[in-house]
């Protein structure tokens, strides 16, 4: 019987700032039970020393029968979502999701936008701010967010800056907490989220949805582990769906993503602009949009987890990035 290790950080309600991206205990428990029902052994590990010890001690001749589900998000480091993929690749152990290189790259929103722009993907102008400057290069109003955070960390309604006075009041505080900052034009349209499942050259796009929030801004104040405070609207015009599907498939291919990613867009005059790519999306049935997009397609949560595991094993068999680790296991 094959074994799935859920390598995870577990959300701490007493420290929401640092653990906002982490999965809840309820989600980890649901994933455990669901994967176990698929016929796998399941082990959940949330201590870094224990994770590295267990992985290092998997018998070298049996590592192809283990797979690590990457749910470690960490904090502050620009490499934090790559810890598990890098360790697994080095040790020659299968893992779910994208490689360490994709994880590091997509966590840097500014570099990702520069790359996507160079590949012909529509993105807004942007600038990276590492220290205070008297005014942005982009015209007001602008939207300001941390360059390397997820789950809307560091984002509130005050991140929309209308004029010079608000800039001078807001930017020093944000730089102190979340440097560097990404500065973008404020887009007035609706947000859209797109899920892409699969490995290179075999991607599928999930049902596409608008993400609506009470204030119109997707910020940390509406993130919850107990309920979904946003709403998904799947009534997206066919022409827009086709454009987003084509663009999202290109993005997945350009990045070389594996397993699953979520891509977020925002409209301006009904034209979609890519905001960011999340290579480690959540898998909660309560608060994670990827799982909701999947279930909208008429398939079950267990089918989603099974597919993600199968894609991880498939990647292990076919992708050359594992070769060094495999050779050490002989």
List where the protein language model places each region.
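Short beta-strand-to-turn element immediately C-terminal to the catalytic PLP-Schiff-base lysine
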Residues: 129, 155-163, 196-199, 268, ...
């Amino acid at each position: 019987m094959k074994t799935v290790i859920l390598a995870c950080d577990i959300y701490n309600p007493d420290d929401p700032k640092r653990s906002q991206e982490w999965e809840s205990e309820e989600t980890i428990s649901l994933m455990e039970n669901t994967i176990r029902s698929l016929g796998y052994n399941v082990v959940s590990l949330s201590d870094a020393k224990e994770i590295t010890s267990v992985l290092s001690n998997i018998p070298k001749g049996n590592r192809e029968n283990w797979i690590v589900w990457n749910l470690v998000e960490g904090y502050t480091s620009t490499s934090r979502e790559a810890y598990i993929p890098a360790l697994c690749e080095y040790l020659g152990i299968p893992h779910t999701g994208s490689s360490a290189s994709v994880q590091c790259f997509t966590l840097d929103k500014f570099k990702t936008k520069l790359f996507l722009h160079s590949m012909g993907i529509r993105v807004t102008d942007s600038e990276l701010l590492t220290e205070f400057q008297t005014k942005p290069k982009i015209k007001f109003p602008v939207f300001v967010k941390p360059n390397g955070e997820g789950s809307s960390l560091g984002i509130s309604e005050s991140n929309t800056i209308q004029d010079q006075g608000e800039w001078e009041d807001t930017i020093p505080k944000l730089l102190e907490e979340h440097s560097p900052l990404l500065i973008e034009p404020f887009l007035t349209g609706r947000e859209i989220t797109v899920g892409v499942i699969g490995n290179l050259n075999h991607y599928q796009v999930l049902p596409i949805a608008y993400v609506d929030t009470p204030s119109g801004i997707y910020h940390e104040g509406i993130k919850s582990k107990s309920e979904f405070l946003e709403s998904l609207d799947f009534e997206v015009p066919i022409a827009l769906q086709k454009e987003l599907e084509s663009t999202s498939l290109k993005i997945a291919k350009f990045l070389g993503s594996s397993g699953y990613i979520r891509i977020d867009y925002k409209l301006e005059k009904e034209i979609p602009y890519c905001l960011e790519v999340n290579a480690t999306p959540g898998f909660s049935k309560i608060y994670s949009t990827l799982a909701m997009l999947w279930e909208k397609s008429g398939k079950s949560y267990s089918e989603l987890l099974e597919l993600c595991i199968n894609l991880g094993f498939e990647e292990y068999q076919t992708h050359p990035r594992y070769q060094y680790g495999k050779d050490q296991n002989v």
